[in-house]
C-alpha cells in the first residue's frame, strides 16, 4: 500500500475489495498505447465496473507521455491533477506512484530518472529487449540510486514475460529484501512466488514468499488473492 501523501488534494489510493478478476471487455485505449501502468499491472486486470473506472484516460495518457519524454515537472503536475479529478480511475495508484517517483528521484540533470522513463517508453512501444538494455545500463551506472528497485522490477517483469523464471525471481528477491524499503516489495514477493510455481519448484518455497507478503504487508491490495493462493497451496501439501 502506498504511503499517505503530503500534498493534500489528491485522495489516498483505493484498494480492490477482493481478488483481481479478468477484465470483461477490451482494455482501455491507453493500455494499448503505453502499456499498463506500474500499479495497474501489479494489481492485475481489474474488472471495469463503471464508466468512472476509465474516465480520464486522455488525461492519463497526456501525463504518461510527458513522463516518457522526460518532462518531469509537467508530468508530476498532470498526474496530480488526474488523481484529484478521477479518483475512481483504475490508474489512480499508478498516477500517484509517478508523482512520488518523480519527487523522490529529482537531481541535477535527472539522468537516472530519464533512463527509467526511457526504459518504460521502450517497453510500452513493444521493445522489451531494448527496455531491458536501458534498465541494465541504469543499474550499472547508478547502482545505488533510489530508482534502482524500479529498474529491477522492470527487468523482473521482462524476464517473466520471456519465461526466464530464474532471472525474474533473482531480481524480485532483491526488491523484496526487507532492507530495500521499496514500495514495490510486496509486488516483488508475489512475483517471486508466482515464478517459483511457474518453474515447478517445491510449493513450500512459494508458500514462504506469499506468507512473507501477508505478514509484512497485511494491508496490501495483493493480500486477498495471495491469501486465497496460500490456502490452495496448503490443501495440496
Q: Model-predicted segments: where are they?
A:
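Acidic, polar-rich low-complexity tracts and alpha-helical solenoid repeat scaffolds
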Residues: 7-237
Amino acid at each position: 500500500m502506498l504511503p499517505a501523501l503530503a500534498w493534500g488534494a489528491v485522495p489516498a489510493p483505493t484498494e480492490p475489495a477482493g481478488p483481481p478478476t479478468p477484465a470483461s471487455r477490451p482494455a482501455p485505449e491507453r493500455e494499448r498505447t503505453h502499456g499498463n501502468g506500474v500499479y495497474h499491472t501489479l494489481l492485475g486486470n481489474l474488472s471495469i465496473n463503471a464508466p468512472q473506472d476509465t474516465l480520464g484516460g486522455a488525461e492519463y495518457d497526456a501525463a504518461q507521455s510527458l513522463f516518457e519524454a522526460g518532462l518531469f515537472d509537467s508530468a508530476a503536475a498532470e498526474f496530480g491533477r488526474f488523481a484529484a479529478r478521477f479518483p475512481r480511475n483504475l490508474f489512480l495508484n499508478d498516477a500517484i506512484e509517478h508523482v512520488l517517483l518523480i519527487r523522490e528521484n529529482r537531481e541535477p540533470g535527472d539522468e537516472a530518472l530519464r533512463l527509467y522513463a526511457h526504459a518504460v517508453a521502450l517497453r510500452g512501444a513493444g521493445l522489451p529487449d531494448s527496455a531491458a538494455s536501458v534498465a541494465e545500463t541504469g543499474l550499472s551506472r547508478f547502482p545505488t540510486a533510489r530508482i534502482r528497485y524500479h529498474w529491477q522490477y522492470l527487468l523482473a517483469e521482462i524476464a517473466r514475460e520471456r519465461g526466464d523464471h530464474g532471472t525474474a525471481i533473482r531480481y524480485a528477491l532483491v526488491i523484496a529484501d526487507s532492507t530495500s524499503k521499496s514500495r514495490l516489495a510486496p509486488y516483488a514477493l508475489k512475483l517471486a512466488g508466482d515464478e517459483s510455481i511457474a518453474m515447478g519448484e517445491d510449493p513450500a518455497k512459494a508458500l514462504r514468499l506469499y506468507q512473507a507478503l501477508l505478514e509484512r504487508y497485511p494491508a496490501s491490495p495483493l493480500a486477498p488473492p495471495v491469501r486465497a493462493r496460500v490456502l490452495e497451496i496448503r490443501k495440496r501439501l
